[in-house]
Amino acid sequence: MEHYRAIWISDVHLGTPGCQAKYLLDFLKHNESDTLYLVGDIIDGWRLKKSIYWPQSHNDVVQKILRKARKGTEVVYVPGNHDESIRQFLGLSFGDIRVVPEAIHTTADGRKLWITHGDLFDGVMQYAK
């Protein structure tokens, strides 16, 4: 089992047939961290609005993340454009997962990293809504 100070995961797109949920679940089972950052497009709300696709492996990923949060991993969710509906819950916590518009991570040597989803800088996405 590997342990890291922080792990960043983005663009998983749970809810789509192309999602590699089994690989992600295997990664989550073999890697621990003090903080787990979910940096947007974890769930593909755009796809789920069109048709429901949610196999057991996608549910298993969500359950694994919730278990990590319950066991003490700080889980921070920064929504992206495909899971933008979650932005209505900014500032709240769900199952010990904090939903925030952005985050700051401090590295071991004291540097600060700003964490946000790139759709904020995508002019096409900003005007496509």
Set out the residue ranges of the language-model regions.
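Proteins with a high burden of low-complexity, intrinsically disordered sequence enriched in S/T/G/P/A and R
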Residues: D11, W46, M125-K129
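Active-site-proximal beta-strand elements of phosphoester/diester hydrolases
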Residues: R5-H13, K112-D119
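Active-site-proximal loop/helix segment associated with metal-binding centers of metalloenzymes
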Residues: I115-K129
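Core catalytic region of metal-dependent phosphoesterases/phosphodiesterases
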Residues: E2-R5, L14-A108
